[in-house]
Amino acid sequence: MKAADITLREARIEDAAFVADLDTALRPEDPQDPVIYEDYWRNPDESSKVERFIGELEGTRVAYASQRHTNWKTSTRYGGVGGDVLPAQRTPERLDGLFTAMEDRSRADGAQTFTTWAWEDDDLRLQVLTKRGYREERRQRFWELDLVANRAKLEAMAAASREKMREQHITVLTIDRDDDPEKFTKLWRMSNEAEQDVPTTVPHVEGAFEDFMKWMRSPGLREDRIWIARDGDRVLGVSILSYPPKRGVVQTDWTGVGRAGRGKGVARALKCETVMQAIALGVDKVRTDNDFKNAPILHINDTMGYRRRPDGIQLMRGA
């Protein structure tokens, strides 16, 4: 399969590290971890189909492309397409070729709408996508929190949140300290409920428990760093920081609160515990990202001292 002058072949597990290196080369300020990439490739989501390809020039790897979609459980069939090229070989023609190839495969699978992402400061990619007919659909806000500069503020917020949780008889603890044998099942159900209320254009598809546990066992997560909130028998919420084992910045993997836990300050309490733990572990900064219309969590980020980074833009076009 060709993409401009690039030859595409099916990706193999051992190519995951190359893709992490490619993404890191494109945005050195946002290094990606090859260990996490490889684990993600080895443990696909059973509710989705994904195809990955490596692009070569004269036998040398220079590009990556993919197309993925859920198992068509929603009324509108959204196909995710993407790809990129190493900086030295990155041209509009090659990017355009990658999207042409992936759109063709996605369309053949039955996609009705293509969706992809670009950073707001990636002019070349945005120009290519605009010429292909893509239009901005929504944005993802990206943030960074300086744990050194904001330590005093965060300590005060954490103390206030702990008191508020005590007053409401809500227990906040890491999941390794929870002796409930059903804790992961309850966490999975709560997370699915919380995810349904996150603003989105592409509908959320409830994930299987087996896929959830693959994620819980992924290299960046540890049970002693997964914070949950409980009210008696119920799991109300969760907040998790991912710690890249090889390279990268510590960042939020997921913060979610079920409907029974909202309006109680649970999300703030959980996020405070994750960052206080990060400080104790010697981390100097953490990052997070949220949908641009998720007002409650955006407000928490602002009050904690997070500062904006470039947005991610979701773009769509008809197939």
Q: What function would you assign to each model-found segment?
A:
Residues M1-Y40, A160-E206:
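Short amphipathic alpha-helix that is part of the acyltransferase structural core
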Residues I13-A16, D23-D121, R230-G258, G318:
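Conserved donor-binding loop and adjoining core beta-sheet/short helix segment
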Residues M1-K2, L86-D179, I313-R317:
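Acyl-donor-binding surface of acyltransferase catalytic domains
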Residues T91-D104, V257, G263-M276, H299, ...:
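Conserved acetyl-CoA-binding loop-helix of GNAT-fold acetyltransferases
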